Amino acid sequence: MKLTCMMIVAVLFLTAWTFVTAVPHSSNVLENLYLKARHEMENQEASKLNMRDDDCEPPGNFCGFPKIGGPCCSGWCFFACA
């Protein structure tokens, strides 16, 4: 019973702490993201999604240290592009 009460108090404390430390203007952040997305829909030349990266390495070329992302067109690098 004591453990249950302690867990309830801990959850309530953490919930209150989350609300106290939350960003006060977080709704403006979401609004700005919405406006940016809307602008990119209206002006497709401004969209980063339509840009193609022609500087990437084709499969089989050396890319360096194993990583995700990197210079490979596929995004997978394990010493050679996948």
Swiss-Prot record:
Residues 23-52 form a propeptide. It is found in: Secreted. Its main location: secreted. Transmembrane segments: none annotated. Disulfide bonds join C56-C73, C63-C77, C72-C81. Expressed by the venom duct. The modification 6'-bromotryptophan is found at W76. GO terms for molecular function: calcium channel regulator activity; ion channel inhibitor activity; toxin activity. One of its GO terms (cellular component) is extracellular region. Residues 1-22 form the signal peptide. Keywords: Bromination, Calcium channel impairing toxin, Disulfide bond, Ion channel impairing toxin, Knottin, Secreted, Signal, Toxin. The keyword Manganese does not apply. Pfam families: Conotoxin. Mostly non-hydroxylated. Two forms of this peptides have been described. Am6.2a (Am3136) is not unmodified, while Am6.2b (Am3214) is Trp-76 brominated. Both forms are found in venom with a much more abundant brominated form. It comes from the Eukaryota. PROSITE patterns: OMEGA_CONOTOXIN (PS60004). Belongs to the conotoxin O1 family. Omega-conotoxins act at presynaptic membranes, they bind and block voltage-gated calcium channels (Cav). The cysteine framework is VI/VII (C-C-CC-C-C). This is Omega-conotoxin-like Am6.2. It comes from Conus amadis (Amadis cone).
